[in-house]
């Protein structure tokens, strides 16, 4: 018994991610710390003019417990550090050809041997990187030579230009398309506490 006509389809997608990063660390007298970093990322899936984006960041810390004026100020205090940071990160969570109008093939419902080509997505060359800005301020502390230690962190992050699917009017002939349309903000406080109840030394 014959199997009928056999059709073969192939799909090929190609894209490229490239990233460059540089970082500089500075430490003075084990008291003052400064770190600066810079990242440049590229994604071939974006249109010309939007393929590359820059994401800098900076952080600083101050070990207060190393300062003379902090000695014997707080009973039992063995370590105290203030720190802060601010930086940008990027996200390119789209498919390889999301900025282009793409086509697909199909068969007519009345004649399976008739092949036709149709446009199945809209172009949006304005798509660009989603960017998250994050700031953090923290305090690390230790008491009794580290038998009690912990940290307090206050953070806030905001993501702009999130890459989301947005519904389109029926008259366009498409149900949805990708846009830089989302925004989300996170903020909070994190606490941690560690204790050494039994020291075997």
Question: Model-flagged regions — what are they?
Answer:
Residues 1, 5-201:
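Extracellular/periplasmic, surface-exposed regions of secreted and cell-surface proteins
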């Amino acid at each position: 018994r014959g199997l009928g006509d056999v059709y073969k389809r192939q799909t090929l997608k190609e894209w490229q991610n490239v990233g460059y990063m540089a970082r500089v660390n500075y430490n003075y007298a084990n008291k003052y710390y400064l770190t600066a970093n810079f990242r440049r990322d590229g994604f071939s899936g974006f249109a010309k003019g939007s393929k590359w984006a820059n994401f800098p960041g900076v952080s600083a810390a101050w070990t207060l417990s190393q300062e003379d004026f902090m000695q014997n100020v707080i009973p039992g205090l063995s370590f105290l550090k203030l720190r802060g940071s601010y930086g940008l990160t990027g996200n390119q969570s789209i498919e390889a050809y999301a900025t282009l109008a793409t086509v697909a093939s199909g068969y007519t419902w009345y004649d399976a041997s008739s092949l036709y080509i149709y446009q199945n997505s809209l172009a949006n060359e304005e798509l660009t990187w989603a960017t998250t800005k994050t700031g953090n301020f923290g305090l690390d502390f230790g008491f009794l030579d580290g038998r009690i230690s912990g940290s307090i962190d206050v953070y806030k992050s905001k993501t702009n230009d999130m890459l989301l699917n947005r519904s389109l009017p029926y008259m366009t002939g498409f149900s949805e398309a990708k846009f830089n349309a989302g925004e989300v903000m996170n903020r909070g406080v994190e606490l941690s506490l560690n204790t050494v109840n039994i020291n075997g030394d």
